[in-house]
Design a protein with these regions (language model features):
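Short, charged/polar "capping" segments at the starts of alpha-helices
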Residues: 33-38, 100-102, 147-148
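Internal alpha-helical scaffold of NAD(P)-dependent oxidoreductase catalytic cores
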Residues: 86, 103, 107, 130-177, ...
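Rossmann-like NAD(P)(H) cofactor-binding subdomain of soluble oxidoreductases
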Residues: 45-130
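Glycine-rich beta-alpha junction loops
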Residues: 32, 96-98, 116-121, 135, ...
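NAD(P)+-binding Rossmann beta1-loop-alpha1 motif at the extreme N-terminus of oxidoreductases
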Residues: 1-50
Length: 217
């Protein structure tokens, strides 16, 4: 499958790198990372230890079988505008936050799938991405249920990623948001690593943030 990873930062580079052995992958990212991948390949470190050789560019291709969108959610509208007019069979958001699928669908003609990803990734140097934790990808129609397209994309991703095709993506998106609210926001504000929330004084704040998200959901 011809796969474009739009947003080749930490997560996008890791996901694209893990798929590059079995698919024709193009990473769309920024310099100097793109230049390094072109010159030396993409080095996978941490939980994985190998070098792969995806394509790398700063501009999205005009066509692809699948686009994986991994930009930060505040960049979704800009990414959607850049992808508009492209000939794609499917677009899959692997982003945090809510509403990314609707933003993408308003610009691209291809069907949009929802997804979550729990792999940990860190871009340590240009051309080098470290996997800090092996997780999984869940994907499916953004309104829930099943589809032949989701099954086909899930089969393709399973070549390099732990993949689940799920019929309850709305629930999974909210659950991921609750986890992010309870962990990411609190650790950033308290300037502590994730593990300090388990028994530290910020545990109550993390619990309350996740619970509030669940009530909103």
């Amino acid at each position: 499958m011809d796969i474009c990873v739009f947003g080749a930062g930490s997560l996008g580079s890791l996901v694209g790198g893990l798929l590059a052995d079995d698919h024709e992958v193009t990473l769309v990212g920024r310099e100097p990372h793109v230049r390094a991948v072109r010159k030396r390949g993409l080095q996978l470190a941490g939980e994985f230890d190998r070098t792969v050789y995806p394509g790398a560019t700063t501009d999205p291709p005009a066509s692809a079988d699948l686009v994986l969108v991994t930009v930060k959610s505040f960049d979704t509208a800009a990414a959607a505008a850049q992808l508009a007019g492209g000939a794609f069979d499917a677009v899959l958001s692997l982003q945090n936050g809510m509403g990314n699928e609707e933003t993408l669908a308003a610009h691209v003609s291809a069907p949009v799938l929802a997804g979550t990803c729990t792999y940990g990734a860190r871009l340590t140097d240009p051309g080098v991405v470290e996997c800090t934790g092996v997780g999984g990808v869940a994907l499916g129609p953004p309104d829930g249920g099943s589809s032949e397209l989701a099954d086909r994309v899930g089969t393709a991703l399973a070549a390099g990623l732990e993949t689940t095709v799920a019929g309850d993506m709305p629930r999974r998106l909210w659950a991921k948001l609750a986890v992010n609210a309870g962990i990411n926001a609190v650790t950033a504000l308290a300037r502590v690593p994730n593990g300090d929330l388990v028994d530290g004084p910020a545990r109550t704040v993390a619990h309350d943030a996740a619970s509030e998200t669940a009530r909103v959901a």
